[in-house]
Amino acid sequence: MNVQAIIKDIESEYLKTDLPTIHVGDTVRVGVRIREGGKERVQPYEGTVIAMRNGGINETITVRRVFQGVGVERVFLLHSPRVADIKVVRRGKVRRAKLYYLRNRVGKATRIRQRFDRPV
């Protein structure tokens, strides 16, 4: 076995299998595990997926939302133990693989059309 096959074999046991199919433009709710003091809770973070990077265990999504007039982006490792769950709230119809142009838009210009041909 070569090195890449060994790494892939080791990584495969850490991959999550219960992830929904996520596309760029979708609005998702990500449950993030937060530890405060001695307690652990799940904090939801809802926003639009503006970028995806595939790469096995290093697969990430960038989620953007506007909070109190300020744009906030977070990058989530999909297979991380910190990510409790991911739920697709609505499907978006876009023609780009990366939606970085939304950073320069304000208000109603950031809206994305809804897609009805994919189930939520």
UniProtKB/Swiss-Prot annotation:
Q: Which UniProt keywords apply?
A: Ribonucleoprotein, Ribosomal protein
GO biological process per UniProt: translation
Write down the InterPro entries for this protein, in alphabetical order. Answer: Ribosomal_bL19 (IPR001857), Ribosomal_bL19_CS (IPR018257), Ribosomal_bL19_sf (IPR038657), Translation_prot_SH3-like_sf (IPR008991)
Disulfide bond entries: none
GO CC entries: cytosolic large ribosomal subunit
Which GO molecular-function terms appear in the entry? structural constituent of ribosome
Q: Which PANTHER family did the record assign?
A: LARGE RIBOSOMAL SUBUNIT PROTEIN BL19M, RIBOSOMAL PROTEIN L19
Give the UniProt family note.
Belongs to the bacterial ribosomal protein bL19 family.
Q: What does this protein do?
A: This protein is located at the 30S-50S ribosomal subunit interface and may play a role in the structure and function of the aminoacyl-tRNA binding site.
Question: What name does UniProt use for this protein?
Answer: Large ribosomal subunit protein bL19
Organism, as annotated? Crocosphaera subtropica (strain ATCC 51142 / BH68) (Cyanothece sp. (strain ATCC 51142))
